Design a protein with these regions (language model features):
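Two-component/phosphorelay signaling modules centered on CheY-like receiver
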Residues: 14-32
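Acidic, metal-coordinating helix/loop segments flanking the phosphotransfer/catalytic sites
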Residues: 32-50
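Conserved phosphotransfer cores of two-component systems
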Residues: 44-46, 69-76
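Hydrophobic/aromatic residues positioned on beta-strands within the core alpha/beta folds
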Residues: 82-83
Length: 120
């Protein structure tokens, strides 16, 4: 039996962390969560295969700053950004490998499978 690919979900809303966790797990991946609180986020020590990052973070820690922190900790893990926008926001584009509009779980799973492969 192989180990499932892990997806780290970063959001400031605990409800969104749970919802996206369910979607990720239903797709066959292991979900990890990191909640952004005002000006900090505690990233897990373990290796992750992909990072799912909410663009619309409240507080002092922006999605761009969070993406920079993610890059320094998980250099090889691609970042997939979630946003209410219709296209990827320009300021975060250099840090991420993909974009999914919020509210489309099927598209999210499709992008996860494209980026991680359907091995899980």
């Amino acid at each position: 039996m192989h180990e499932k690919d892990s997806v780290l979900i970063i959001d400031d809303d605990p409800m969104h962390l749970r919802i996206y966790g369910w979607i990720v797990e239903a797709a066959g991946y292991r979900a990890l969560a990191a909640q952004v609180e005002l000006d900090k986020v505690v990233l897990p020590e373990e290796t992750v295969d992909l990072v799912l990052l909410d663009y619309n973070l409240s507080g002092a820690l922006s999605a761009v700053k969070t993406a920079e922190l993610v890059r320094s900790r998980y250099a090889q893990a691609p970042i997939l950004v979630l946003s209410d926008a219709y296209s990827m926001p320009d300021d975060i584009a250099p840090y991420v490998r993909g974009f999914v509009r919020k509210g489309d779980p099927a598209k999210l799973v499709e992008r996860l499978r494209e980026m991680l492969g359907s091995r899980s």
